[in-house]
Amino acid sequence: KNEELKFEYRNSIISQKNIIVLETRLKLKKGESQEIKSKMDEYAKSRKEKQPIEYPSAGSTFKRGKDFITAKLIDEAGLKGYQIGGAQVSEKHAGFIINKGDATATDILNLIEYVKKEIHKKFDKNIELEVQVIGEK
């Protein structure tokens, strides 16, 4: 239940305490199959237009800030397309770091740190990772 897990925008007790969910029960609503398919197609089209799904990535790299849109700041900082090794800030959506083909974990982590430092330097904002980094460089 929401009260127990304290769900909020991209956060919950589950993510704070590194809990692994092994089982869940979902409550679904019935709907018209054609209407559901139409919505799914709409979401897929929107995702394809706005997100760099043609390249490997871990999805959205940075969380949206409380009072700012992180991807917008990254774009305004001129970092779209910025690359370290094979890791690049997506030109399609600045909130994604993509693998242009030969990125190493070190390339990606170095690019993340560079973006975080540039945003802090230019806008005095601290941006948070949405992805979880496991392991070391």
Describe each PLM feature range.
Residues 1-110, 117, 122, 126-137:
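Phosphate/pyrophosphate- and phosphate-bearing ligand-binding catalytic cores of soluble enzymes
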